[in-house]
A protein has these predicted regions:
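Non-catalytic interface/linker regions that flank or bridge core catalytic/transmembrane domains
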Residues: 1-42
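All-alpha helical catalytic cores of prenyl diphosphate-utilizing isoprenoid enzymes
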Residues: 29-36, 49-61
């Protein structure tokens, strides 16, 4: 699903994704990928937070804003300055191809072809997605563009916290013990999705 994203929106996104020294966190290749695969128009969910076109971007930006605020307020130390930007903005990168508009009917053309009619107000899971998963998938997709630190990998992998599968709760706890920013990432995600509702 290619994105229709205005020049001013691209500029705003790129400016937001800059470190205090002006270094861009997002390469041109990464930006092309985000545009081509629908990051800016995808929803964040089918029926919960951010379940509208552009919801993934809004949710991801809010998580990043919360994570940056938590970092400053709590004097969090990250291995790399870019980490809260990458973790916050791309923790749900897995969702770029995870949802689609459901087909509600078809229009038969004169030549016998059928054109689907989509419900543009609703979302459903896309069964055609080849790469499944959540945190793991986001890490795999990001690895095409970044050499991620162990801390970034764990923060993205376990950002769901206790909402992850019960069989992984011990792993989540161990990840938090080794990389405390995993817990802060989960908190930023919960603030965005459950408090702000984005």
């Amino acid at each position: 699903m290619p994105d229709c994203f205005s020049k001013s929106e691209v500029t705003d996104f790129m400016n937001f994704m800059k470190l205090p020294d002006g270094t861009s966190v997002v390469s041109d290749d990464m930006m092309e990928y985000l545009m081509a695969y629908g990051f800016f128009t995808a929803p964040a969910s089918t029926k919960y937070h951010g379940n509208y076109e552009g919801g993934l971007l809004n949710h991801s930006r809010m998580v990043t804003e919360y994570l940056l605020a938590l970092t400053q307020a709590n004097h969090l130390i990250w291995r790399k300055a870019r980490s809260p930007f990458i973790v916050g903005m791309f923790h749900d990168l897995c969702k770029i191809d995870q949802y689609r508009h459901p087909v509600t009917g078809h229009i038969e053309e004169f030549n016998g072809d059928c054109t689907p009619i989509y419900d543009e107000q609703a979302w459903e899971y896309n069964p055609d997605t080849l790469l499944k998963g959540h945190g793991d998938k986001s890490v795999m997709l990001l690895s095409q563009f970044y050499t991620l630190t162990d801390e970034e990998i764990m923060c993205i992998r376990y950002h769901m916290g206790a909402f992850t599968d019960k069989s992984e709760w011990n792993d989540y706890t161990r990840a938090v013990c080794q990389y405390p920013n995993v817990l802060w990432t989960h908190q930023a995600d919960m603030l965005a999705s459950h408090v702000a509702g984005v």
